[in-house]
């Protein structure tokens, strides 16, 4: 991704999974399974790390813009 390109994506997060990974359906929607529990922002931090690795950007470029306490989130990748 270039430094000026921004992308907002809808994501469904499933905390307390046995394995952390990202699934993409045919429509391009992401379902992200994280091992961390949804306590104290742990699942959100793991989500940010997984997405940064998936999109090959730094963690600072991944931002939760909606749904910080929900399983359904809108994420911005800068």
How should each PLM-predicted stretch be described?
Residues 1-31:
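N-terminal first-folded block
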Residues 7, 48-78:
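C-terminal structural segments of small proteins and small subunits
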Residues 12, 16, 31-35, 59, ...:
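Basic side chains
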Residues 27, 39-40, 66:
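Short glycine-rich loop/turn motifs that provide flexible caps or phosphate-binding loops at active sites
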